């Protein structure tokens, strides 16, 4: 990843492993959404040892972090796990709806009412995450991710993003412009950017890269949105 960052002239790389990729976290939290593949870490020390391998890598600042799921009923347990170490950056993500419903589940009902209700529940859950103090996170990631499983977004999607970004601004959080979703749902990411422009909510660019060739993906598209809507980037 660091080598790929240097090749693409990235000066700062934040590595944020999913909290669900740690075996000890899965022992205390029942995650409704997990990656079926990818490395599992036995401990935070196991993970942090990977950063020792890239110390002194000229030209790239590497930040150690986590992408942490917000699951209301497990907020305390997740918070205790995350607080075991000091992190350079913490991201907060909602990957599941209450009841452990995976956002990317394509088998859920897709009629207009069901889809709209699901989107509203998703936005409310993200607001809850922002207002929560379960971890001291800086960035709410991919607020449009539900589109993977529920592609029919509500007609007032941008209004919902205005409400969400307003809450984020009030609580000192930034909202992510996600590189993966700029490929999958560019029109929704654009509406997220527009909403942040209206509320003066800060944004962050994240490539959401799981492989080296995805580092800085769609950064050019994110940059255009940042310029168009006069967004402040953290």
Q: What is the predicted role of each segment?
A:
Residues 185-234:
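Long, positively charged, glycine-interspersed low-complexity recognition regions
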Residues 12, 61-65, 88-91, 137-139, ...:
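Structural preference for beta-strand elements that scaffold enzyme active sites
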Residues 57-58, 86, 171, 199, ...:
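Structured helix-beta-strand junction loops
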Residues 28-30, 77-80, 104-107, 154-156, ...:
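Short, glycine/charged-enriched secondary-structure capping and boundary segments
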Residues 1-72, 82, 147-151, 155-159, ...:
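An N-terminally biased module of ancient metal coordination in phosphate/nucleic-acid-related enzymes
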Residues 92-199:
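Domain-core and long-helix interface of multi-subunit machines
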């Amino acid at each position: 990843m660091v080598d790929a960052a240097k090749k693409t002239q990235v000066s700062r790389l934040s590595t944020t492993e999913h909290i669900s990729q740690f075996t000890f976290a899965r022992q205390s939290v029942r995650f409704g959404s997990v990656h079926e593949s990818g490395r599992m870490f036995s401990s935070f020390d196991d993970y942090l040892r990977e950063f020792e391998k890239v110390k002194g890598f000229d030209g790239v600042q590497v930040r150690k972090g986590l992408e942490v799921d917000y699951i209301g009923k497990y907020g305390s347990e997740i918070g205790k796990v995350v607080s075991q170490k000091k992190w350079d950056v913490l991201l907060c993500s909602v990957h599941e709806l209450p009841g452990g419903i995976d956002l990317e589940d394509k088998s859920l009902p897709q009629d207009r009412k069901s889809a709209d209700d699901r989107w509203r529940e998703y936005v409310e859950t993200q607001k809850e995450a922002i207002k929560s103090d379960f971890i001291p996170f800086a960035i709410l990631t991919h607020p449009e991710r539900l589109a993977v499983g529920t592609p029919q977004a509500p007609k007032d999607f941008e209004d919902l993003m205005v409400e969400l970004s307003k809450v984020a601004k009030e609580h000192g959080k930034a909202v992510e412009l996600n590189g993966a979703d700029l490929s999958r749902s560019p029109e929704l990411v654009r509406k997220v950017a527009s909403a942040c422009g209206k509320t003066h909510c800060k944004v962050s660019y994240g490539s959401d890269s799981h492989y080296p060739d995805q580092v800085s993906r769609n950064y050019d598209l994110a940059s255009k949105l940042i310029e168009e809507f006069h967004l402040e980037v953290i």
